[in-house]
Design a protein with these regions (language model features):
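Membrane-anchoring hydrophobic helices of lipid-metabolizing enzymes
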Residues: 1-62, 68-79, 83, 105, ...
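A short, conserved acidic/glycine-rich loop-to-beta-strand motif
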Residues: 63, 90-94, 184-190
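Structural motif
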Residues: 63-65, 93, 115, 147-149
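Glycine-/small-residue-rich active-site loops that bind phosphorylated ligands and cofactors
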Residues: 69-71, 99-100, 121-124, 154-155
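Short helix/loop capping segments that flank catalytic or ligand/cofactor-binding pockets
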Residues: 73-75, 101-104, 157-158, 197
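A short alpha->loop->secondary-structure connector
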Residues: 82-90
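Conserved nucleotide-cofactor-binding alpha/beta core module
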Residues: 91-119, 126
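Non-catalytic C-terminal accessory region of glycerolipid acyltransferases
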Residues: 124-333
C-alpha cells in the first residue's frame, strides 16, 4: 500500500470521540506524516533569535503571518508542527476563491478555518473586511491563535512582501492603528521549500498573464495547483518562527512618537517593513549545486502553453529561487 493511501478499516479503528475536528483527524492519522515522508526530506520547525522569547510570545496565542508558497501545505504543516510541539491549533484564513468544488468548502469549514471573502464589489468588500476584522479581534481577545498569509495569493516570483491591504483589513476594528496591530500579536513565520513543486505552473501563469493581461486562472487550474503542491517533491522544508513584532513596535514608537500622527498608509508601510524583515531574515538558505541548471531545464520541459517563450520562462524560474536570497541579504544589511 502506498504511504498516502487510507484504508476505511483503519479509519474505523479510531475512536471518534478522540477526534474533535477534521484538523485533529489529519494530525492524529498519519496522512500528513505520509505526505512529509513521500514528498520531502523533512519538515522542520526552527527559530530565529531567542527561542524562549518566541515561546513566551506565542504562549497566550499569536497571529502567525507567513509568506505564501503552497495553497494547502503552508498552513497544514504549520498546524501540525504547532499542534505537536505546543498544542496550539490555529484558526486558518483561506480565500473563498479556492472553493472550486463544494467538498473543498465543507472540508475547510470543518478544519477550523475562516473564510476571507474576495471578488465582491467595493462596498461589499469593505463590509466583509469589517466583519472579518471584528471576528479576528474576537478570536485574539479569546487568546486564540490564527494563521494568515502576508498577501492575497502566492507570490509567483517568491518576492515575499506584506500587502498593506491585508494589514488594513486586519485592523479595521478599533481606533488606534498601532494598538490594533499590537493586539494581534503578529509573530511572522518564514516558510522555505528547497524545491517548489508548483514552480513550473507559476512560471506558466506569468507568461499567460504577460501575453494576455485579462487571463485568469480557472477553478480547474486552482485544483491542479493544489494537487501538484500536495504531491510534488519539495526537498527540505523549514518553518522558522520569529519573535512578535510588538517588541520592535514598542521600541520604534518610543524613539519616534511622531509616527502615531503620520498618515495611515505610512504607518502601514512601517509595520509591513518590520514583518517583511522578520520573514526575510528567517529564510533557510539552500546550497545550489551544479545540477541546479539541469533541474531548471527539467521544470521548463513540463510547461505546455501556447507560444511557449523558453527564455522568459527560464528567467522566471531562476527568479523564484533567487529572490529569497536577495531579500535575505538585504534584510541583514
Amino acid at each position: 500500500m502506498e504511504n498516502n493511501e487510507i484504508r476505511f478499516k483503519d479509519i474505523r479503528a479510531y475512536r471518534v470521540g478522540w477526534l474533535l475536528t477534521i484538523c485533529d483527524f489529519l494530525i492524529a492519522f498519519p496522512i500528513l506524516w505520509a505526505w512529509e515522508k513521500r514528498t520531502t526530506k523533512g519538515v522542520k520547525l526552527d527559530y530565529l533569535g531567542d527561542r524562549k522569547q518566541i515561546e513566551a510570545d506565542i504562549k497566550h496565542g499569536a497571529f502567525f503571518m507567513t509568506n505564501h508558497r503552497d495553497i494547502v501545505m503552508d498552513s497544514a504543516w504549520l498546524s501540525k508542527l504547532l499542534r505537536c510541539r505546543y498544542f496550539i491549533r490555529p484558526f486558518i484564513g483561506i480565500g473563498n476563491n479556492l472553493f472550486a468544488y463544494k467538498w473543498i468548502e465543507v472540508l475547510v469549514r470543518f478544519n477550523r478555518c475562516f473564510v476571507v471573502k474576495r471578488g465582491a464589489g467595493a462596498h461589499a468588500q469593505l463590509e466583509n473586511a469589517k466583519q472579518l476584522s471584528a471576528y479576528i479581534r474576537h478570536l485574539r481577545e479569546q487568546g486564540k491563535s490564527i494563521w494568515l498569509a502576508q498577501r492575497e495569493g502566492r507570490a509567483k516570483d517568491s518576492n515575499d512582501l506584506t500587502q498593506t491591504s491585508v494589514l488594513h483589513m486586519l485592523t479595521l476594528d478599533g481606533d488606534d492603528f498601532f494598538e490594533n496591530v499590537k493586539m494581534l500579536n503578529i509573530c511572522p513565520v518564514s516558510i522555505t521549500y528547497e524545491f517548489d513543486p508548483c514552480d513550473y505552473l507559476k512560471a506558466a501563469e506569468m507568461q499567460l498573464k504577460r501575453d494576455n493581461p485579462r487571463w485568469r486562472k480557472t477553478k480547474k487550474d486552482d485544483v491542479h495547483s493544489m494537487h501538484t503542491g500536495i504531491r510534488g517533491e519539495k526537498g527540505h522544508v523549514v518553518y522558522r518562527l520569529t519573535p512578535s513584532i510588538n517588541h520592535e513596535l514598542d521600541a520604534m514608537l518610543a524613539q519616534h512618537p511622531e509616527y502615531r500622527e503620520v498618515p495611515l498608509h505610512d504607518q502601514m508601510d512601517q509595520v509591513c517593513a518590520i514583518i517583511d524583515r522578520h520573514i526575510h531574515r528567517g529564510y533557510e538558505m539552500y546550497e545550489r549545486g551544479t545540477d541546479f541548471d539541469a533541474y531548471i531545464e527539467s521544470r521548463l520541459a513540463l510547461i505546455d502553453i501556447p507560444n511557449k517563450d523558453e527564455a522568459f520562462l527560464r528567467e522566471k524560474l531562476y527568479e523564484m529561487y533567487n529572490n529569497p536570497v536577495i531579500n535575505y541579504k538585504k534584510a541583514y544589511e
